[in-house]
Amino acid sequence: VRHLNEKKTDSTMIAQMQLNIHLADAADKVCREFVQNDSTIYAMDDFGFWYAKTISSTSSDSIQQGQEIPLHIQISEIRGTLISDIKYQYIMGSGELPTAITRSLKMMCIGDQMHIVAPWYTAYGVEGTKIIKPYSNLFIIITIEQ
């Protein structure tokens, strides 16, 4: 009996993985279309999100691991509805932000602003948050304030 249950679990996991691959492909298509229709010129990160530095400060001080930085983060659904607009102190490397934001911060200096087009798997994933639905593709503006 145990052996049969293990096979069922394996097939359930495989089905879930296949579904997530399909959903990731669909998210990539939506994000690519957004980027192609926007006037901003984006680059694609190895993890699958798109980014564009829209304000470059004169500072050359990159953000260091453990450094506390003042952030302004605006998160919208990719189709335009603003979900969140917050300012707070973030400790670089604390792990509380999704991949698309933390990887973008590593490319920024104090005073910079970056636009991010994030498919769900680089944003808040399959679980979402209290205000962001699971599998949400997002447009994010992050500013490291001075």
Segments from the language model and where they lie:
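Cross-family detector of peptidyl-prolyl cis-trans isomerase
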Residues: V1-Q146
